[in-house]
């Protein structure tokens, strides 16, 4: 008997606007005897971000029923968070999914609208007894699953309420997620083997006689999206579509300042080979069906071998262009396909390790991988799996002061929390090395004062993902911009501490419409009279000194973290408790933390606060602690008062204005 999935039955929602999943384990097994005896009724497989038949345990479990109905619903609540390029990928993936299912005598039903309405109708139409859906960690997707379950609870079905099973693709054989170490260092010591992917299941049941629906064109899909009643205002859509660098360099050019980038560089169009896997209009990411992704992955892994194939040469060229730092090209090229589930993480790992063994006569070296591309692919999916597991664990574990939510930004998992039901929107942004719990003593107090409060752990910190990429101030500012647009959905009062204050100032400078007011607490950044700063560049180069410096810094921080943090709380050292230090130490062992620390050596704070805030016409409050160990507080405060007359700047632990 082979265990293929660990779905869990949904419970009723526990409170208004909050859906909770009961963690009753239900092990789905497929044995030869079970294959011969089909379960009664039919099963609906609800595809969301699992657009494949390969290594799809939900489809495998459903194949044991008398009939299977694969379903994909173009739902505004999912699609509204996709870029146009991601929408293109969805269409190509669905085209391949339909083709693969038709080869087995099945199909995928295509519908437009609210998924709960279609599933409710289909249950009676096809006599479905079970619904299979992949378990998610993103808040909006978990909400949608909860809404489906609530709809079932209030509907009288002819043959009774169907069960909803949540399935996973287990990267590791983990019996109980709560038993998993919270430290990645301890997790690595377990040496858990990665499970092998499964092949596409055989759908031997009868084909249902239903209207499967046509696959839309991209224009049809865009028309549907434009009819979205919850569509963002056009001005906000434009805000997201223009990069921070583009806006900033345009502002600098108008003010006569210098930059190292030329925005008017024209790139000649490159003719794509006939078998190109770069299927979108922009052509920056790998797309198509599972087989196309596997072909591109084979080309990526074999980069050092060279090739005469045009399609593989194209992959190699894109790899070189996307390699902003060693290994960063993998997620740049394959990340969207992984996020849409066109290929599973463990399939990528399996293919990478298989190729590594082929290169080394069947052996794996204990000293690491033999090629950069194998390391990039294997490390990326292992890292993604770790953060997915930690996100899921934080969602199902009881306890803790604040409820955790997950938002996916550019393919990466970001943790945040929310408090308050009414009032103005407030967004709290932490400093370097911290996380949203930095404000654990403030969140509820601000909410009880009549506000709705969001606190986010930005990329690279806390329990948010720490990908292999180049970290810049503009990248973090864009994350905050998108969080306001996608999660909060309205202008906010922005509060930032330390380097988080600098990110907040950039957001206020570049996107006035998103910010109602700004509060900077011991903010990073300087004040330069008349903005006579050096030329700005968003280009960052990794170097040997930065590589070494990050490792020495990490070693030093782990040894001295308690004393360092206490210096930042000179009048309230009791706040530096065991939990805070333990969580900071835990995060220091996360995969990718060294990449984040390397960014310290390339921070570019050349844009002074006085420049960033001068065009912001709303209220600005600057709070500077006089015992701040990081800066010369008195000198900085005097400069702020002189060159930022629009800001109110009280002094903490000293004389006030």
Regions found by a protein language model. Give the residues of each.
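Trp/Phe/Arg-rich N-terminal binding region typifying the photolyase-homology
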Residues: 2-234
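Glycine/tryptophan-enriched, flexible segments
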Residues: 39, 183-391
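Active-site loop/oxyanion-hole signature of alpha/beta-hydrolase fold enzymes
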Residues: 403-410, 415-418, 448-496, 532
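Serine-hydrolase catalytic-loop signature spanning alpha/beta hydrolases and amidase-signature enzymes
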Residues: 423, 431-441, 453
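Conserved loop-alpha-helix segment in the C-terminal half of the alpha/beta-hydrolase fold
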Residues: 446-448, 615-655
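Gly/Ala-rich beta-loop-alpha elbow adjacent to hydrolase catalytic centers
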Residues: 496, 500, 504
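Flexible "cap/lid" loop of the alpha/beta hydrolase fold
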Residues: 505-510, 514-551
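Conserved alpha/beta-hydrolase catalytic His-Asp/Glu region
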Residues: 529-534, 552-618
């Amino acid at each position: 008997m082979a265990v293929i999935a660990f779905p869990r039955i949904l419970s009723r929602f526990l409170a208004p606007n909050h859906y909770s999943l009961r963690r009753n384990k239900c092990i789905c097994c497929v044995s030869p005897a079970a294959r011969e005896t089909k379960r009664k009724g039919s099963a609906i497989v609800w595809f969301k971000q699992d657009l494949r038949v390969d290594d799809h345990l939900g489809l495998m479990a459903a194949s044991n029923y008398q009939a299977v109905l694969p379903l994909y619903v173009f739902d505004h609540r999912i699609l509204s968070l996709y870029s146009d390029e991601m929408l293109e990928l969805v269409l190509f993936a669905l085209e391949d999914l339909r083709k693969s299912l038709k080869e087995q005598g099945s199909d995928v039903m295509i519908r437009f609208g609210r998924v709960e309405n279609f599933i409710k109708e289909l249950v009676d139409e096809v006599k479905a007894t079970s619904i299979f859906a992949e378990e998610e960690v993103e808040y909006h997707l978990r909400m949608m699953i909860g809404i489906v379950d609530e709809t079932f609870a209030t509907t009288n079905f002819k043959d009774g309420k169907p069960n909803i099973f949540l399935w996973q693709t287990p990267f590791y054989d983990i019996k109980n997620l709560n038993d998993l170490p919270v430290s990645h260092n301890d997790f690595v010591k377990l040496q858990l083997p990665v499970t092998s992917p499964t092949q596409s299941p055989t759908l031997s049941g009868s084909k249902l006689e239903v209207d499967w629906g046509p696959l839309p064109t991209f224009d049809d899909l865009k028309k549907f999206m434009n009819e979205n009643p919850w569509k963002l205002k056009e001005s906000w859509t434009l805000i997201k579509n223009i990069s921070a660098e583009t806006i900033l360099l345009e502002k600098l050019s108008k003010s006569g300042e210098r930059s190292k980038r030329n925005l008017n560089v024209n790139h000649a169009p490159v003719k794509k080979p006939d078998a190109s896997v770069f299927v979108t209009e922009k052509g920056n990411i790998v797309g198509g069906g599972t087989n196309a992704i596997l072909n591109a992955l084979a080309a990526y892994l074999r980069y050092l071998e060279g090739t005469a194939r045009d399609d593989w040469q194209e992959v190699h060229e894109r790899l070189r262009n996307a390699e902003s730092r060693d290994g960063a090209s993998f997620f740049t090229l394959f990340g969207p396909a992984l996020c849409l589930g066109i290929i599973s993480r463990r399939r990528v790992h399996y293919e990478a390790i298989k190729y590594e063994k082929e290169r080394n006569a069947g052996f794996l070296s204990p000293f690491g991988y033999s090629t950069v591309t194998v390391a990039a692919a294997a490390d990326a999916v292992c890292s993604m799996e770790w953060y997915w597991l930690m996100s899921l664990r934080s969602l199902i574990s009881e306890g803790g002061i604040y409820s955790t939510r997950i938002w996916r930004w550019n393919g990466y998992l970001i943790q945040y929390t929310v408090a308050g039901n009414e009032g103005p929107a407030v967004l709290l942004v932490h400093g370097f090395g911290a996380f949203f719990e930095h404000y654990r003593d403030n969140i509820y107090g601000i909410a009880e004062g009549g506000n709705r409060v969001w606190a986010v752990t930005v990329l690279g910190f806390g329990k948010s993902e720490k990908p292999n990429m180049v970290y810049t101030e503009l990248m973090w500012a864009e994350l905050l911009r998108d969080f306001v647009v996608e999660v909060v959905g309205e202008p906010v009062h922005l509060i930032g501490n330390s380097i988080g204050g600098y990110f907040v100032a950039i957001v206020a400078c570049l996107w006035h419409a998103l910010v109602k007011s700004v509060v900077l607490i011991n903010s990073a950044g300087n004040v330069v009279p008349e903005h006579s700063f050096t030329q700005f560049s968003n280009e960052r180069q990794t170097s040997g000194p930065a590589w070494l410096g990050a490792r020495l810094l990490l070693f030093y921080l782990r040894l001295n973290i308690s004393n360092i943090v206490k210096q930042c709380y000179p009048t309230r050292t009791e706040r530096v408790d065991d939990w805070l230090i333990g969580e900071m130490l835990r995060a220091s062992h996360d995969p990718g933390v060294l990449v984040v620390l390397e960014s310290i050596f390339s921070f570019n704070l050349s844009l002074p606060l006085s420049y960033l805030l001068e065009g912001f016409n709303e209220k600005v409050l600057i709070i500077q602690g006089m015992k701040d160990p990081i800066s010369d507080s008195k000198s900085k405060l005097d400069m702020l008062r002189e060159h930022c007359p629009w800001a109110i700047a009280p002094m903490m632990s000293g004389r006030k204005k």
